[in-house]
Curated annotation (Swiss-Prot):
Keywords: Aspartyl protease, Hydrolase, Metal-binding, Nickel, Protease. Gene3D superfamilies: HybD-like. Pfam families: HycI (PF01750). GO terms for molecular function: aspartic-type endopeptidase activity; endopeptidase activity; enzyme activator activity; metal ion binding. Protease involved in the C-terminal processing of HybC, the large subunit of hydrogenase 2. Specifically cleaves off a 15 amino acid peptide from the C-terminus of the precursor of HybC. Ni(2+) binds at residues 16, 62, 93. This is Hydrogenase 2 maturation protease. Belongs to the peptidase A31 family. InterPro entries: Pept_A31_hyd_express, Pept_HybD-like_dom_sf, Peptidase_A31. GO terms for biological process: protein processing.
Amino acid sequence: MRILVLGVGNILLTDEAIGVRIVEALEQRYILPDYVEILDGGTAGMELLGDMANRDHLIIADAIVSKKNAPGTMMILRDEEVPALFTNKISPHQLGLADVLSALRFTGEFPKKLTLVGVIPESLEPHIGLTPTVEAMIEPALEQVLAALRESGVEAIPREAIHD
């Protein structure tokens, strides 16, 4: 079993950092089996090809732009819904992710299961730190990442449970 939890986003553009902040919270607060990798992908694109290839489950946490939904709204997309979303995105890393997913499909290395946990940003202005609206979504989004892991039979162990 090979699972990757990938957080992507630009920490210099306010809410664009949500994906990175979600995986940071996961790594800080939970212990996962060795076959589950957590990766801060930042704004990387094709450089992630090797990391994303041949995964049993790829879970991506990211900010996703939507004109239909209010800032702070969480969206969960699965499998074929994910590449479709990235075909009309605005940020450079999402174009890169679309290319990576296309390349993985072309080479036969597409993940067996793909989950996107996305949060609609309120601001993409240059600034370090999330808006309160999006920061409030770290916890619910983290719960969705944990639920996606459970779907693949992974039970995350809270770090504080180890110290009790």
